[in-house]
Amino acid sequence: MSTISSVTISELLDAGIHYGHKASRWNPKMAPYIYGKRDDVHIINLDYTASQIDVVSKVIYKEIKEKNGRILFVDTRRHRDIVAQYAENCGQYYVTHRWLGGMLTNWVTVSKAINKLDQLEKKLADPEKIAGYTKREILSMQRMRDNLQRSFGGIRNMGGKPTLLIVMDINKDHIAVKEARREKIPIIAIVDTNSDPDLVDYPIPGNDDAIRSIRLYCKIFSDAVLLAIEHMLAASGVDLGAINDDSPSERLKAAKKITKMKPSKKVTKINVGQDQNKLEKDNKDL
């Protein structure tokens, strides 16, 4: 049976994870993780990075296999498509468009918005239900659906608050970090040389900007989740040989059957406009 693989220094170097920011932008709390400077750019000590990645891989594995947890990936920058793809591939959840204040601290409102998204999709997919609407009204509903999908599509099936957060840039997505700390949700995060490692539970010192770096982090995290799912299936007597190894979705479906994941409660009679305003207000209050 497969085991968690350790990342090599060579892999980290190839992904450019050792490159930090300009020395003038550094956070002194990152000093223990900095190897030195090159052309006024801090170089990260990859021994610490490799060690912490091993720790984090075990944390992710345990969160899925032993706790049946929900992991939320967060990155609202240009890497969003990479992060979303890896999160989907391992059956987890993501916020990659924009973090709306209250996504963790105002979960009731988030649940209502997700319910509204479900209702709109069902209505727009049924010709009989939209037959009495004008083209302008239908276009308005489509736009609302698209906006809700961008904001909540990655968490619509999460069924509750996440039990673990993975953040790629704690400076950009500082509101997500602040909310997770308030809700006592453990945080795994990439901490570049301009970041504060004390803000998260499991800091991984490394480049948080390069696409190659983000792709490697996501692959490592996704592999840990998929390995946990593989072991869950094996422990439940599922014939892994009968499941297509090239199709993670098939294993995810089988895993959900044995863990009996419960969907979130649906809330009716909502005003999504008011709910969006609540999230915006929470965003300002943080």
Region spans (language model):
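N-terminal, positively charged regions that mediate nucleic acid binding
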Residues: 1-69, 75, 79
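Short, ordered loop/turn segments at secondary-structure junctions
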Residues: 17, 48, 76-79, 92, ...
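Short glycine/threonine-rich loop/turn motifs
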Residues: 175-234, 238
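Long, charge-dense
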Residues: 84-141
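Intrinsically disordered, compositionally biased charged tails
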Residues: 1-6, 230-286
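Extended, charged alpha-helical interaction scaffolds
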Residues: 129-167, 171-188, 192
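Residue-level signature of catalytic and energy-coupling elements of molecular machines
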Residues: 16, 73, 165, 217
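Hydrophobic/aromatic ligand-binding patch that stacks against planar heteroaromatic rings
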Residues: 62, 85-86, 178-179
